[in-house]
Amino acid sequence: MAGSALAVRARLGVWGMRVLQTRGFGSDSSESMDSGAGSIREAGGAFGKREKAEEDRYFREKTREQLAALKKHHEDEIDHHSKEIERLQKQIERHKKKIKYLKNSEH
C-alpha cells in the first residue's frame, strides 16, 4: 500500500495527492450505494415481478442465442473436418496407386 501511494504521489505531484486525500473525507460512492439500493425489485409487488420476468426472458433469449451460435460453430467444425477427411482419403488413394504402379514397374 505504501509503495502504491508513493507511486501515485510521484505521478500526481503534491496537488494530485491533496485531491486524493480530500476525497477520503467524503462518503465513498461504493459504500453509500448498496447493491440494488432503491431498486424496484426490492420493493416487491407487481413491478418487481414484472422486472424479474423481463430479466429472466432476456437471459433465456441470450442463452438461446449462445446455444445457437455454439451449435453452428460445431456444425461448421464437423463440415470442415469431413472435408479434410475426404481430402486426406483422396491423398491416401493417390499414394496407394503410386505404390501399386511402382510394384508393377519393378517386374
Swiss-Prot record:
Region called N-terminal inhibitory region, residue ranges: 26-52
N6-succinyllysine modification, residue list: K103
Domain of life: Eukaryota
Residue span of the annotated presequence: 1-25
GO terms classed as biological process: erythrocyte differentiation; heme biosynthetic process; mitochondrial depolarization; negative regulation of endothelial cell proliferation; negative regulation of hydrolase activity; negative regulation of mitochondrial ATP synthesis coupled proton transport; positive regulation of mitochondrial outer membrane permeabilization involved in apoptotic signaling pathway; positive regulation of proteolysis involved in protein catabolic process
Domain notes: Forms an alpha-helical dimer with monomers associated via an antiparallel alpha-helical coiled coil composed of residues 74-106, leaving each N-terminal inhibitory region (residues 26-52) accessible for interaction with an F1 catalytic domain. The inhibitory N-terminal region (residues 26-52) binds the alpha(ADP-bound)-beta(ADP-bound) (ATP5F1A-ATP5F1B) interface of F1-ATPase, and also contact the central gamma subunit (ATP5F1C).
Quaternary assembly: Homodimer; represents the active form and is present at a pH value below 6.5. Homotetramer; represents the inactive form and is present at a pH value above 7.0.
Name of this chain's protein: ATPase inhibitor, mitochondrial
Originating organism: Rattus norvegicus
Gene name linked to the record: Atp5if1
